[in-house]
A protein has these predicted regions:
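Conserved, well-structured ligand/cofactor-binding cores
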Residues: 2-171
Length: 171
């Protein structure tokens, strides 16, 4: 998982390039010439981050690859966590048949017809989290390709999916 965390950090760097002052389609028309510089300066001061203005404001307005990339990095974490949880479920299968290589702590009552059975509820919950993150990534991917010309009207659902996935993975 250490490599996946590094991938998340790397993907997050794309969010430091913004299109402030680009206006609706990235031309900057009707915006005060100093607006972008003032915004960048204020954002850097407020966040303490090294935020930069995009070189191509038109491209930055329609391109949502920063969200697509970050969502994909979160999906990689989810896929790896899912595999680990599947391994835990298999290794903990038992007690009379199955591998029974490890014993997971009982988090709830087991089966009434199989005494001693411990349901792998924590790995199962993590499987469900992974499936949701993977589904959110599909939504972000499809929304990213839904841009038409200079504008992507799908950014709200992309942001919602990214925030939800981040929240699920952190908790």
């Amino acid at each position: 998982l250490e490599q996946e965390v590094k991938n998340l950090d790397f993907a997050a760097q794309d969010f430091l390039t913004v299109n402030m002052g680009a206006t609706a389609i990235g031309t900057g028309i009707t915006a005060e010439p100093e607006y972008a510089e003032m915004c960048i300066e204020a954002l850097c001061k407020i966040t303490g981050l090294d935020i930069k203005l995009a070189d191509d404001l038109i491209g930055a307005t329609s391109d949502t690859s920063c969200m697509v990339g970050y969502s994909a990095a979160m999906k990689r974490v989810a896929v790896k966590m899912n595999k680990i949880c599947n391994d835990l479920r298999l290794l903990a299968s038992g007690p009379r048949c199955g591998l029974g290589e490890i014993n997971l702590p009982a988090m709830q009552p087991g089966s009434s017809i199989m005494p001693g059975k411990v349901n792998p509820v924590i790995p199962e919950v993590m499987n469900q989290v992974a499936y949701k993150v993977i589904g959110n990534d599909l939504c972000v991917t499809m929304s990213g390709e839904a841009a038409q010309m200079e504008l992507n009207a799908m950014e709200p659902v992309m942001a919602q999916c990214c925030f939800e996935s981040a929240d699920l993975l952190m908790n």
